[in-house]
Amino acid sequence: HEYDWVLRPWNPGWSPKQALIDCASPTYALEEGKYVKYPPFGGLEMWDFPEPVGRLPVTHHSHEEIYSMPATFKGVKDLDFKYYMMYQPAIFYAMGLCSQEKVKVKDTEVAPIDVVTAMVPPPQNNIFGATDKQLEYADKTAFIELVVEVSGEKDGKPFTWTANCPKMNAPGPELKKIYGTALVYVSLPLATGTMLIDEMDMPKGIIFADQL
């Protein structure tokens, strides 16, 4: 069923606590050359992703590209990073359950975010615990789209260039045989970038992924 995800245990695929902290953090967007601060889940809009993902709500999200890309590509005046609005974290945030401030519950003091993350399955269950059958099902039902849209001028005329990075963690069973997990959409680019840095003549200091 298209809504079966509502009853599935939420698991972002990495540290649940860090995921909630990121979602509940204010962030920035570069607008006309100046950074503008947005609240958590600010800038809500609908975005049309390629099928089968389709139309989804997206919001501003705390991510490094907001700062790295203007430093890498000189002249950039407008830039934002938006993430699809994960419903479970959005509801947790609205209820105050992403707070790291401790509250007193009977005779115990506890941070709401620690209660939530204690109930969420650990990420290793998702990373290393998936069976081939589960991965085959995910190949057919779970999809990821990452879209980069660049607008500017080319030859004096307005120009927009769009790049789409579809689901990287498929086919799941084959990736699991090679890497031990199918969730490689963060680790594989990181490993590839590390190899590129070793092979390229790069300046000393911090190297942004955008520079590669």
Q: Where do the PLM segments sit?
A:
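C-terminal catalytic/substrate-binding lobe primarily of soluble NAD(P)-dependent oxidoreductases
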Residues: 1-212
